[in-house]
């Protein structure tokens, strides 16, 4: 993992943005902007920070890939049913796709004050467009 190149980071960045394509607006653009901002903020990270950054974003990407593939498989299995019963826009805000996962207790305890503030800000921003009742 110590031999990460700029191409590895670029590939991961692109994979994350590709995974975000399954999200409905405004979650997609919010997620894309968050990823872009994080990448810019970590351009001058130390090698140790860069490895941690890559590892955590790689975990996120793998979670998204697994969930995306599951959703795509489910949609392809139900494609005829969906096409026959739904003539509405595919990005209907009432049909949010639940992607991602909550942080566990260990992850929450490992966050520093700035990260907690950033997480709270992200929760606040996303709550304006998505609430648990939308699931």
Curated annotation (Swiss-Prot):
Gene Ontology CC entries for this record? mitochondrial intermembrane space; mitochondrial matrix
Sorted keywords for this record are: Chaperone, Mitochondrion, Transit peptide
Could you tell me where the Low complexity compositional bias lies? 75-95
Q: Quote any Pfam family the record assigns.
A: Complex1_LYR_2
Outline the segment boundaries, as ranges, of region: Disordered. 73-101
- Which BP terms does GO give this entry? mitochondrial respiratory chain complex II assembly; succinate metabolic process
Task: Indicate the transmembrane segments per the record.
Answer: none
Among InterPro entries, the record links this protein to: SDHAF3/Sdh7
Where does the record say this protein resides?
Mitochondrion matrix
Q: Which domain of life is it from?
A: Eukaryota
**Residues forming coiled coils:** none
**Subunit info?**
Interacts with the iron-sulfur protein subunit within the SDH catalytic dimer.
Sum up the protein's function in the record's words. Answer: Plays an essential role in the assembly of succinate dehydrogenase (SDH), an enzyme complex (also referred to as respiratory complex II) that is a component of both the tricarboxylic acid (TCA) cycle and the mitochondrial electron transport chain, and which couples the oxidation of succinate to fumarate with the reduction of ubiquinone (coenzyme Q) to ubiquinol. Promotes maturation of the iron-sulfur protein subunit of the SDH catalytic dimer, protecting it from the deleterious effects of oxidants. May act together with SDHAF1.
| Family stated for the protein in its record | Belongs to the complex I LYR family. SDHAF3 subfamily.
Tell me the protein's name. Answer: Succinate dehydrogenase assembly factor 3, mitochondrial
Q: Which organism is it from?
A: Dictyostelium discoideum (Social amoeba)
């Amino acid at each position: 993992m110590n031999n990460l190149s700029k191409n590895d980071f670029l590939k991961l960045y692109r994979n994350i943005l590709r995974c975000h394509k399954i999200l409905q607006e405004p979650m997609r653009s919010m997620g894309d902007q968050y990823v872009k901002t994080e990448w810019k903020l970590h351009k001058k990270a130390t090698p140790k920070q860069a490895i941690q950054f890559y590892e955590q974003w790689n975990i996120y990407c793998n979670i998204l890939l697994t969930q995306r593939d599951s959703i795509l498989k489910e949609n392809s299995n139900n494609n005829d049913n969906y096409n026959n019963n739904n003539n509405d826009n595919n990005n209907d805000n009432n049909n949010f796709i639940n992607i991602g996962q909550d942080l566990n207790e260990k992850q929450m305890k490992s966050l520093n004050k700035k990260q907690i503030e950033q997480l709270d800000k992200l929760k606040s921003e996303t709550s304006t467009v998505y609430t648990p009742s939308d699931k």
